A protein has these predicted regions:
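Short C-terminal tail/terminal secondary-structure segment
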Residues: 11, 62, 139, 150-163
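Substrate-binding pocket helix/loop in short-chain dehydrogenase/reductase
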Residues: 12-14, 21-23, 108, 116-119
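Catalytic Tyr-X3-Lys loop
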Residues: 15-35, 49, 53, 77, ...
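Active-site helix of classical SDR
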Residues: 37, 73, 81
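Alpha-helical segment proximal to the catalytic Tyr-Lys
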Residues: 42, 86-90
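Residue(s) in the substrate-gating loop at a strand-loop-helix junction
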Residues: 57
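Short, small/polar-rich loop/turn modules that mediate ligand/substrate recognition or access, typified
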Residues: 89, 94, 149-151
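A conserved structural motif in NAD(P)-dependent oxidoreductases
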Residues: 123-134
Length: 163
């Protein structure tokens, strides 16, 4: 299962955020990820095999200004991945996630040009992630070549996070 729930939400300070925006971002990004994981687990346990790849974000590790709901929701995806990785390992189910820096996808349609420029300035590689690069990482991570890793958080940040 490749689980890529995500919306950016408003680009606002916490003071300017309203509770409905906060809940909407977390419902899609974190709750959506939770429910997709949940509905797969029983069948995977019955097969004694499964691979789940959740798509988080580098914002979940580092936070982004004026994007607290998005950052918090993606941090939740990382924590959920780690928890499920431990919880399901005995059933030969691997649960991992990637934490990409920004990739030019439809989520950019929700962002201001200033915010897009800000994000690019934080990536030492000086470019956005190509979705084909992410796809290659995902294919490997869910393959049998990677049968040992679970609860893993694979960094695709172009050098933004180096820890």
């Amino acid at each position: 299962v490749i689980n890529s729930a995500g919306i950016a939400g408003p680009n606002k300070t916490v003071e300017d955020y309203n509770i409905n925006d906060w809940r909407r971002v977390n419902r899609v990004n974190l709750d959506g990820t939770f429910f997709v994981n949940k509905v797969c687990i029983t069948d995977m346990k019955n097969e004694n095999y499964g691979r789940i790849m959740n798509i988080a974000s580098i914002a979940g590790k580092e936070g982004n200004p004026n994007a607290s709901a998005y950052s918090a929701s993606k941090a939740g995806v990382i924590a959920l991945t780690k928890s499920l990785g431990k919880e399901l390992a005995e059933f030969n189910i691997s649960v991992n996630c990637i934490t990409p820096a920004a990739a030019k996808t439809r989520i950019f349609d929700q962002m201001s040009e200033d915010h897009i420029s800000y994000m690019l300035s934080k990536i030492p590689r000086g470019r956005f992630l190509d979705v084909k690069e992410a796809a290659k990482m995902i294919v490997w991570a869910v393959s049998d070549e990677n049968s040992f890793t679970t609860g893993g958080v694979f960094d695709l940040s172009g050098g933004r996070a180096t820890y």
